[in-house]
């Protein structure tokens, strides 16, 4: 995540997509609720009407699996209407022309056909996101657990960079993980291919460092098995 929970509570505007936070991440959601109660506008894009959507300025019921088209539609409006942060993009981002060429293929009308969200709603959301700085974006497994999950994540990041919302307090991209403390477990090295801090077991320098720190003669130099490999 690029923001802390303390940032969540003080956000100026929040965009939640593919996340039933109130049930899956109630602690994180409590900070979002604090921000909303303090006046931060909230937009929730989710096929279902979740409890968090009831607190939103607007619930956007996109079709399952249409996230990229919907996000491309938003970015199309930002670019064609000149609402994106031109200075931020020019000074901090790469690949803008390639992104522009792609999202211009998704005017709101085409994005609406795919996502089920009206073209007018797409325009409204894009304009609202551009009206406040910074905006904080959050997503969960509703974005990642798809065959197009990587593209979903890239689209979320591209949207925030286009708006100039990455690298600032109260503005960023915040993925909430899928299982209880999976982030902390991974950070600490509870994975079959890395030590603490994602330092690979097949890296001799990393092994030597942890052998010395842990006071052991040798550590495994081959990655262990992932769950699919165990099942096989």
Language-model-detected regions and their locations in the chain:
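Surface-exposed loop and adjacent secondary-structure segments within mature catalytic domains
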Residues: 181-202
